[in-house]
Amino acid sequence: MAKKKIYSDIEFPTEIVAESKSAYGLKTYISLFSSAGVGCYGFKQEGYYCIATVELLERRLNVQKCNNKCAYNSGYICGDMTEQSTKDKIFRELDIWKHGFGVDDLDVLIATPPCQGMSVANHKKKDELKRNSLVVESILMVKSITPKFFIFENVRAFLTSVCTDLDGNDKSIREAIEANLSGLYNISYNVLNFKDYGNPSSRTRTLVIGVRKDLKEITPYDVFPDKQPEQTLRQVIGDMPSLQTMGEICPDDIYHNFRKYAPRMEAWISEIKEGQSAFDNTEISRIPHTVKDGVIVYNAQKNGDKYTRQYWDKVAPCIHTRNDIMASQNTVHPVDNRVFSIREVMRMMSVPPTFKWSEQSLEELNALSVKEKEAYLKKEEINIRHTLGEAVPTIIFKQIAHKVRKVLCRSTLSEQEIKNLIEKRNLTDAAKLIEFIKKSTTHTFAELSKIAELANAQHDNNAAYYTRQDLCFTIVSSLPIPKGQTTVNILEPSIGVGNFLPTLIRKYESATEVNIDVVDIDANSIAILKELVQKIYVPVNVHITYINDDFLLHQFDKKYDVVVGNPPYMKLTKEKKLLAQYKAEAYNKNTNNIFAFFIEKAIKIGKFVSLIVPKSLINAPEFNDTRELIGQNAIRRIIDFGEKGFKGVKIETICLQVDTVAKQSDTVVESYITDEVECHPQSYITSSEYPYWLIYRNAEFDKVADRLTFNVFKSYRDRTITKAITKPTGRIRVLKSRNIGDNTIIDIPDYDSYIDDVNNLDVAKYLNQTECVLLPNLTYNPRACFMPKGCIADGSVAILTPNENETITEQDLAFYATELFSHFYAIARNRGSRSLNIDNNSVYFFGKLKHTTL
């Protein structure tokens, strides 16, 4: 055992320390509301270490101890998740693993908060618990710990149930998850029946999986359980011995038992066949009833599956908490006159035989006398059955655990390795690239498509760049699923090598028919794509049509439900004839950048448009008309990737999602810069009050705006002064950005520049114009001063000319240097990192104080 000074009283097992230093390190998780640990036993099976497990009921936590779930006894936390003391215990365990084993980044957080108020099965729960505070506590723990993955599992109605969010407002649980976690995580929301994913019984549940956005190329789809054929009840328990005597316990398995019930009830089920209920009996005496004061009172049949004998050759029924009584749902054995035994229920919930309910081994329990077995079952059976009815099937979490480990441990090719591979195999030759893809058995689709994108000889000419799978998921997860349609028509207008296809197919695979038309101007890209498609699963209901043509000139004969993609960003300067063709149909004729033309055409032929485009769309004067056109539609979502969209490409990007059919309402802004998601009325962030969209606009921005009168300057920047024409001394000083201080000029040795003659320079018109204001051009920390006599400024400084009749004071300029204005200005510039030039749009925000007091 090793010891760490900071926790001198704690021993750190050397085998765990050794594993923590291995190539792949430890895999860890925390489980909240873990009950007996049936579900997360799947993580133990996959070799994960449980840092902490939290359960309110000690008897259930004790079951977890029987299975040696945690390395430290302190990891078993019996407590209420609404209490700070419970949370503090979790954070202490995290700290122990951080200092003892170097675990500073939790892999998985699991939360299965009690579903009180959400179950559709229990008619007695009439008053929905609006707060659902335990769900909110789960969200808060994810926010606090920020694990790589989080998993929420709950009942079917989970996402639509109401909770009081952290902001104090009532909203659906899905909205609360979105508001708090979707800035940091890619999240999939699924209501599914676990019988289709490896569980031996029917169980319709909600499964929410979040993947932290800094995990490149990993999406929730990568860790989702696999679809598998259904199993029949006969396949699951048909080999188990029949139990026909009430109270009988299988000698080889204490958990295969005939649970006793009132003998008079046997007649209610003894004559019914598979699929029949005791209420179907024709003899009145065999219909479930009670006798009160000598009067027969027949039982109510609220749930139609009470006292119902199950089918051998159908999927096993859903296991509920009261699987111990026939009056519950679907609990009667297909042949025997009894409810399912504990072991049968365990099998139906995919709980492996290695799972322990007691400190005693199965062999020890089986060796007990009959009376001792009966005493043990009397004490433990209800707890076991109830926990099984509330549990997540072990196989579901086991699959997720396996896949999480796989994606975290898989080796990926670096960009340099890909470049070396391309050079070594001469993959710039399209034929050789296609052959390489065809023969590849070890590379993922993401790796192959990245290789293909980088290898394509037309890469730079077509302005095409690889779109990571995690970014594709971010975009595709927000796309709508058309209601009431059996056929979904999708268009990818610049498909490249098909980066969006895997996520699009997964998103829409449940539709009856999916038609995906893919367009690319490059024939090589289409040929390569066809080979890449062979590497992904394409269901029979998904049809891909390849169109080798110029999207902007192609004639489409239908309206698409979704247009999604990453169009090229490039200005046409030499191909005048082609540009004229594009502009002939364009609304915005003031730009030569073809992505703007892609937006316009997509809006014409698509009901819902989702395109990755340069962030300059939001604010550049060049795209004023494009914004006007877009604003006539419902802007559903803007995802700000900043510079995180494309590695090695010095461009900021956004994803614009526009609904061309619906009415305008709210716009969601999802930011990779702030890791937050906000929602505002579209009219608020696209207000004509300002010269361009303000996607980060908020109340603090508005407070500062109320203090200023805007639109008081015109902006100018020199484009001709370079180092070649300046010198260390001279007649006229050339001011640069670092020379500009707060109402002062800063002298900087070996930095200051001069020029003798400006007569041939356009900037000469500002010489001695002392009312002009100077501002450093590219900064979020503005400061300003007036133009001194005998000076001009180079292009690193914006020269602001006050409008006629405007008087600017030093107090106005001093306000620009305040922290308050700096925050305001960051929002005014949409938190951009590159598009910070002060142009005649952005100069609008350098206003004049309405009152002179700072």
Residue positions per predicted region:
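Class I S-adenosyl-L-methionine
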Residues: M1-A23, I90-L106, C115-K306, A375-E380, R385-T387, A391-K406, A620-D702, T722, ...
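Core alpha/beta nucleotide-donor-binding catalytic domains of modification enzymes
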Residues: Y7-I145, R156-T160, T164-D170, I547, ...
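Non-catalytic DNA-recognition/assembly elements of restriction-modification systems
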Residues: S35, K432, H443-T444, V677-T720, ...
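Short beta-strand element of Class I
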Residues: C50-I51, V514-D517
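Short, conserved SAM-binding/catalytic segment
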Residues: K65-S74, L529-N541
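Signature of N6-adenine DNA methyltransferases within the class I
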Residues: R174, E178, S188-N190, D196-G210, ...
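C-terminal target-recognition/interaction regions appended to catalytic cores
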Residues: R259-L413, K727-L854
